[in-house]
Amino acid sequence: MSTMRLLTLALLFSCSFARAACDPKIVNIGAVLSTRKHEQMFREAVNQANKRHGSWKIQLNATSVTHKPNAIQMALSVCEDLISSQVYAILVSHPPTPNDHFTPTPVSYTAGFYRIPVLGLTTRMSIYSDKSIHLSFLRTVPPYSHQSSVWFEMMRVYSWNHIILLVSDDHEGRAAQKRLETLLEERESKSKKRNYENLDQLSYDHKRGPKAEKVLQFDPGTKNVTALLMEARELEARVIILSASEDDAATVYRAAAMLNMTGSGYVWLVGEREISGNALRYAPDGIIGLQLINGKNESAHISDAVGVVAQAVHELLEKENITDPPRGCVGNTNIWKTGPLFKRVLMSSKYADGVTGRVEFNEDGDRKFANYSIMNLQNRKLVQVGIYNGTHVIPNDRKIIWPGGETEKPRGYQMSTRLKIVTIHQEPFVYVKPTLSDGTCKEEFTVNGDPVKKVICTGPNDTSPGSPRHTVPQCCYGFCIDLLIKLARTMNFTYEVHLVADGKFGTQERVNNSNKKEWNGMMGELLSGQADMIVAPLTINNERAQYIEFSKPFKYQGLTILVKKEIPRSTLDSFMQPFQSTLWLLVGLSVHVVAVMLYLLDRFSPFGRFKVNSEEEEEDALTLSSAMWFSWGVLLNSGIGEGAPRSFSARILGMVWAGFAMIIVASYTANLAAFLVLDRPEERITGINDPRLRNPSDKFIYATVKQSSVDIYFRRQVELSTMYRHMEKHNYESAAEAIQAVRDNKLHAFIWDSAVLEFEASQKCDLVTTGELFFRSGFGIGMRKDSPWKQNVSLSILKSHENGFMEDLDKTWVRYQECDSRSNAPATLTFENMAGVFMLVAGGIVAGIFLIFIEIAYKRHKDARRKQMQLAFAAVNVWRKNLQDRKSGRAEPDPKKKATFRAITSTLASSFKRRRSSKDTQYHPTDITGTLNLSDPSVSTVV
């Protein structure tokens, strides 16, 4: 008996313990719903979730309330009816009244304070995506701002690249604007990764994403948006995207109808609010709107939200030890520690079997991959004409009726026929001259005799840095202006031309030393909307092509180097330039060596003396002076009148010398013409790889233009970094300044576009281009991205190439060669070339005059010596005769003869005495009074 009792007690205890161990964990889920009917649906959805998961460990329990009339009552109800039940999550639907935005807010604030996750069911307002305000809010529907993804995809499908974004200046409008701009920027960043290498192809396309031409905002509740819509009407875009409340949308529709902006050519893309309620009454036919599929189906969202919570609860309880949620709000300020973890599990959930489709959340807790119906208002009724499946738009174009009753897709833009053209002063492509006093342009003619086509262009009268700038009307003409006139006539548009304000082509520069970069020059004006088109010698490069559209190149070119031409200067010794000084010395030495050899050969040869017969005396052999005269005469090809060598050996040498002289003279004559007439090739730059460029020094300065495509090219090329560092210190503000610096010898080399430099070299004969072209590219017309004119401009340029118009422009403006015509003229010698020869003749005359005086002086001196010797011989003879007479015993000499002898001896004695006293004085025989009387009979007799 006692044993039976013990067994019974043991069985009872074991059963009680087993029941305690088998009881599932109760997980309460709260809900704030619209009606009692939806509360019943909520309980059924919870029961279905329990059955679906079939877990004996977890049991979901439904706790719900309905909406309260105000926020305070709603917050109290959440605390008293839901949080007090220790709910793990709260589901909340949007209030049934469309203008009541407060009911989800108190639920989100109250539950968020304790970090209890809140799942919105039909709440679409974008404010709930802000996690700094709504900490624990998730939702199974996307916000209104996510409609921007559908608009963006429709723009891509229909190739609408020009849009106007019209938004209300509230949180909803700003959120839609921000999301759309983010999508546009993402597409833009992807397109920038393209490699634009084949710029020569017309098919190099820029399939960019759409871009908002303008964003127009208006205050919520405004009653007059006419001025705003008039501004939109002046733009090119005809695709208008509207994000506004129902009442604001109705205001916009009424104003648009009055401005005739709802007819043919326009496209209106709107969201769900803009085709609901009061807005639908004023919406124009043809408008395209969106409707979220199951967006207002509260029952479907209840089922999906419960399924997501149930899946997350099971996942959380199986992996983590969780704490219990807070019980009530009174006196409880502690947050639920497991709440943030549970929220992360919910956000990472992927519920594939939802009634509304696949349920996933993004980082803001908003629904991803929502499906939309694309609606078209036709005859005041909304007709579905396509769907958005979460990633792509699938339209049914045959069912769409566009504004104005059109069935063909509008192109989405209107082409303005009045274009603002920006250009830059760059000869020969654009000349800039002041206007006449009456405001007109001076009439001029081209080299072909045709009148020059000029247009009025406004711009600064001086673009040099630091100078005052005044915008004045000026006259522009040249290659690009003729091209602009041709394009305007072909494509039927008008234009107004202005010069770029800062005088630059365009490059990116930092703003206020920040990381932000902006374009300057013509690029900046085009991107900022100050210009519609750039018609100038703008080089096509990758950096610019990422931001603007380029047409087909109208001029192909590259980079080259401009240097100053070394003009040869004729010197007095220019006639000696054909031979080096060493050769001249050898020739001179040869002349004298040959002369000496001729003299010696003729002197020592037995046949060096010549006589006709034996009775005649032999002629003297060749003297040294005659040999010199012969040697020089043969060399200078002058006639030899006398003094020719007599011996056979000397004549052999003379013939060899004549051959030598012929070769020397012929070589000299040939080279003399080249040196006196033709330019000698100087040492120029060989190209970009020249050592003087690759190894820069302060002795050789080269540069380009600041903030130009050439500057960008050298900055981007790593292998040219050394050159760029040298150039950066010497770059000029404009090409004209740099070219003038080359002419003034302030700059040794200027690197720039070949078309410009070759033109300058052809017009300024002291300049020359050198080296081969490098960095080949082309000049193109610049337009904003996806400009409606791009294709037409490129086609027109292609036709101009085909029909020879571009060739004619080249001949008229670029290939006109002034210096070439001068260089092709026959070369003539000038006085400068032959001045040295005349100076040589003058030197010969001076030398001859100098030598004649020396000869005269020498002759007089020689004659005096000879006469002195004659007197001496006469005196000796007289003395000898007298001596003989004495020895023979003859009488005394005649007294007259004695007197004569005394006179002669006295004269000789005084002459020798004076000669010893002064060597430089010449003396002559004198008589007793100081003058020798040669007419004296006795003297003449003695002599």
UniProtKB/Swiss-Prot annotation:
Q: Highest taxon of the source?
A: Eukaryota
Keywords noted in UniProt: Calcium, Cell membrane, Disulfide bond, Glycoprotein, Ion channel, Ion transport, Ligand-gated ion channel, Magnesium, Membrane, Metal-binding, Phosphoprotein, Postsynaptic cell membrane, Receptor, Signal, Synapse, Transmembrane, Transmembrane helix, Transport, Zinc
**Record GO terms (molecular function):** glutamate-gated calcium ion channel activity; glycine binding; ligand-gated sodium channel activity; metal ion binding; NMDA glutamate receptor activity; signaling receptor activity
Per the record, residues carrying Phosphoserine are S910, S911, S917, S918
Q: Which stretches are Extracellular in the membrane topology? A: 21-580, 669-833
Cell location: Cell membrane; Postsynaptic cell membrane; Postsynaptic density membrane; Synaptic cell membrane
Entry-linked Gene3D superfamilies? 1.10.287.70, 3.40.50.2300, Periplasmic binding protein-like II
Which segments sit on the Cytoplasmic face?
602-623, 646-651, 855-943
Residues modified by carbohydrate are: N61, N224, N260, N297, N321, N371, N389, N461, N492, N512, N695, N792
Any matching Pfam family: Lig_chan
Q: Which CDD domains match?
A: PBP1_iGluR_NMDA_NR1, PBP2_iGluR_NMDA_Nr1
Disulphides = C79-C329, C441-C475, C457-C476, C765-C819
Anything noted about its domains? A hydrophobic region that gives rise to the prediction of a transmembrane span does not cross the membrane, but is part of a discontinuously helical region that dips into the membrane and is probably part of the pore and of the selectivity filter.
The similarity comment for this entry is: Belongs to the glutamate-gated ion channel (TC 1.A.10.1) family. NR1/GRIN1 subfamily.
User: Which protein are we looking at?
Assistant: Glutamate receptor ionotropic, NMDA 1
- The species this protein belongs to is Canis lupus familiaris
